[in-house]
Design a protein with these regions (language model features):
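Hydrophobic recognition helices of helix-based DNA-binding modules
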Residues: 2, 68, 110-113, 154, ...
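A generic structural motif
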Residues: 2-7, 116
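Glycine-rich phosphate/pyrophosphate-binding loop and the adjoining helix
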Residues: 116-164
Length: 164
């Protein structure tokens, strides 16, 4: 529908130790950080979907993004995985705010900390435990339209960025 190839990943498939600058100096970034950085860098557009923990992003997401921010291969500039691509954000929570507070923290980290281009459009799915049908589609028509709109903007922007 959106004319895009999609790669779904789970951060659980990229286990890493808690970021520690001393460990990085001693051993370099972990293999999974390099693999995740390469996965991000292989795509012109990245959609990050995450639950909310205590009004912020999950520790797993924060740690993964921190490690990826430290990976430099060859003559790459710092934060290469976050440059020259576009990010879109989504959250889901069983609360009534749908993870909206976590998106603030995630946006701040990506834009200010990593210099990433993050779309202003985002989606927060409230009451997430009951928000999806058995095929993982959003039940609420308004939320489904918003998700499609965010995805369409991500694809359109990524395609423009990828053009030589």
């Amino acid at each position: 529908r959106l004319n895009a190839e999609v790669t779904l990943i789970s951060l659980a498939d990229y286990p890493m130790p808690i970021y520690n600058g001393d460990e990085e100096v001693a051993s370099g970034p972990p293999q999974h950080a390099v693999a995740l950085k390469r996965m991000i860098a292989a795509h012109a557009g990245v959609f990050i979907a995450s639950p909310e923990y205590n009004a912020s992003m999950t520790p797993l997401l924060k740690n993964s993004l921190d490690w990826v921010s430290r990976v430099r291969e060859g003559r790459e500039p710092p934060l290469a995985a976050y440059r020259d691509r576009v990010f879109a954000l989504g959250a889901a929570s069983n609360g009534t705010l749908g993870g909206m507070r976590s998106l603030i923290a995630l946006r701040q980290m990506l834009e200010l900390g990593c210099g990433a281009l993050v779309l202003p459009e985002q989606i927060a799915v409230r009451e997430a435990a009951d928000a999806f049908d058995e095929a993982d589609n959003l039940k609420d028509e308004r939320s489904a339209r918003l998700m499609t709109s965010v995805a369409r903007r991500l694809v359109d922007t990524a395609q423009r960025l990828a053009q030589p």
